[in-house]
Regions:
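Metal-cofactor-binding active-site regions of metalloenzymes
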Residues: 42-50, 99-134
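Short, ordered loop/turn segments at secondary-structure junctions
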Residues: 42, 81, 110, 165, ...
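Metal-associated gating/positioning segment near the N- to mid-region
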Residues: 24-99, 115, 185, 213-214
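Histidine/acidic residue-rich metal-binding segments in metalloenzymes
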Residues: 90, 142-214
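Short, well-ordered coil/turn segments that N-cap beta-strands
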Residues: 73-75, 99-104, 157-158, 195-199
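Hydrophobic faces of well-ordered beta-strands that scaffold small-molecule active sites
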Residues: 29-35, 76-78, 105-109, 160-162, ...
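Active-site mouth loops of central-metabolism enzymes
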Residues: 46-59, 122-147, 179, 200-206
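Histidine-rich, glycine-flanked metal-binding segment
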Residues: 1-27
């Protein structure tokens, strides 16, 4: 099972499998509150959305989940699928259905960003820019933001991920603070919609006004 029922000496159960760990040190399962099972080492130089199929990326995510479990983490919060479509959802569901052993996973699916923001691929020729798959859902107005959250809920995510700022590459050159990608009103719109569906919202925020808005 997944629940500790009793702790003590001389406990007996007719149905339990007994494992002698008297010479071992036993720890409770660890929890990783922010990880990315779809993120691979080659990500920064070659965005996998451009050359890897989502099927292949799902297999990579399976491998990552197994490695995480072997490291002692029995629960993880996967924050953004890195443009791998429903790979994180597939891995979570396969584990929950007993298809293979892995950690308990809570997933956000696609993150939500803006045009020109973090996870929106830049530097592409205008003729192909709109045709290339992105690393996140790009939403520039309240209608698109609400629709994105509803689509994510329909897909079966556990919570919503938004990009309130970019990375340290997107900073104010005078204050060195991360640039805010979303207004307070935009953040509130998405939080309100997520709450309607009983979902939490995780915000990528390196600091500055973006973090305050979140």
């Amino acid at each position: 099972g997944n629940r500790i029922v009793k702790v003590g000496k001389s406990l007996k159960s007719n149905s339990a499998t007994v494992i002698d760990l008297s010479d071992k040190t036993v720890l409770p399962g660890l929890i990783d509150g922010h990880t990315h099972i779809c993120l691979t080492p080659d990500y920064s130089s070659n965005p996998p959305v451009l050359y890897k199929t989502n099927t292949y990326r799902t297999m990579e995510a399976f491998k990552a989940a197994k490695r995480i479990l072997n490291a002692g983490f029995t629960t993880i919060r996967d924050v953004d699928n890195e443009g791998a479509d429903m790979a994180d959802i597939a891995v979570r569901d396969a584990i929950n259905e007993g298809m293979f052993v892995g950690p308990r996973i809570f997933v956000s699916g696609w993150a939500i960003s803006i045009t020109g923001g973090h996870m929106n691929l830049t530097g592409l020729r205008p003729s192909i820019d709109k045709k290339v798959e992105q690393l996140a859902i790009i939403a520039d107005n309240s209608e698109d933001m609400v629709a994105a959250i509803r689509d994510q809920r329909k897909s079966g995510v556990d919570f919503i991920k938004i990009y309130a700022t970019g990375t340290l590459r997107h900073i104010n050159r005078e204050t060195l603070e991360p640039l805010s990608q979303l207004s307070t009103e935009e953040v509130q719109i998405m939080v309100n919609e997520a709450r309607r569906w009983d979902m939490d919202v995780a915000a990528h925020a390196y600091g500055g006004t973006g973090a305050l808005h979140a």
